[in-house]
From Swiss-Prot:
Span list, region Activating region 3 (AR3): 53-59
GO molecular function: cAMP binding; DNA binding, bending; DNA-binding transcription factor activity; identical protein binding; minor groove of adenine-thymine-rich DNA binding; sequence-specific DNA binding
Source organism (scientific name): Escherichia coli (strain K12)
Residue numbers bearing the N6-acetyllysine modification: K101
Quaternary assembly: Homodimer, which upon binding cAMP is able to bind DNA. AR1 of the upstream subunit binds to the C-terminus of RNAP subunit RpoA, AR2 of the downstream subunit binds to the N-terminus of RpoA while AR3 binds to sigma-70 (rpoD). Interacts with SpfP.
Impact upon substituting E59 to G/K: Reduction in activation of class II promoters
Binding site for 3',5'-cyclic AMP 2: A136, F137, Q171, E172, I173, G174, Q175, I176, V177, G178, C179, S180, R181
Domain HTH crp-type residues, every copy: 138-210
Result of changing K53N: Increased activation at class II promoters, increased interaction with RNAP
Traits of the deletion mutant: Not essential (on rich medium), greatly increased levels of cAMP. Eliminates the NaCl sensitivity of an rnlA deletion mutant.
Name of the protein this chain belongs to: DNA-binding transcriptional dual regulator CRP
Result of altering R186L: Marginally reduced DNA-binding
Record-level GO cellular component terms: cytosol; protein-DNA complex
Amino acid sequence: MVLGKPQTDPTLEWFLSHCHIHKYPSKSTLIHQGEKAETLYYIVKGSVAVLIKDEEGKEMILSYLNQGDFIGELGLFEEGQERSAWVRAKTACEVAEISYKKFRQLIQVNPDILMRLSAQMARRLQVTSEKVGNLAFLDVTGRIAQTLLNLAKQPDAMTHPDGMQIKITRQEIGQIVGCSRETVGRILKMLEDQNLISAHGKTIVVYGTR
């Protein structure tokens, strides 16, 4: 083994060789809610936001997905499904795309791909259960604090001498926890006063999270 040489993943490379690779700029839309679901996506590079909108166009962020995550898997298991959410590029992204029909053919050859997808779905169900619990049992301060801790574990969080540094707007935090931007601002100030975080514009340092 050559030192410093990254390890390859033969199964992943084989899967990607059957996909079409597309690049999306930051803030562009990959999936529109309501459109027919026919394609499975896999994030090669970058991160995306999964969100829903109400009739007035108000957005709520359901989750962030990152490199190595599948997108749009629900339609794989039931024909004629429509997309249940919007997916928007959080950063510039490189995404592999494959039709459900072709993916079903691939898993007949190599079931490991389906096992990877199933494992991700199980983890997401666990995260969703935790989020529902937070909505039911935590007040808005607790939900914001939990959100900051979760974001500090994301791949795009940066190490900082005092903890982990994240970049997110107050509006985006409000879209995750379900409150106004003004409420987020007040709670961030309170968390700062308690010496739990520092917040300057979009940059937030969550102390003690390294």
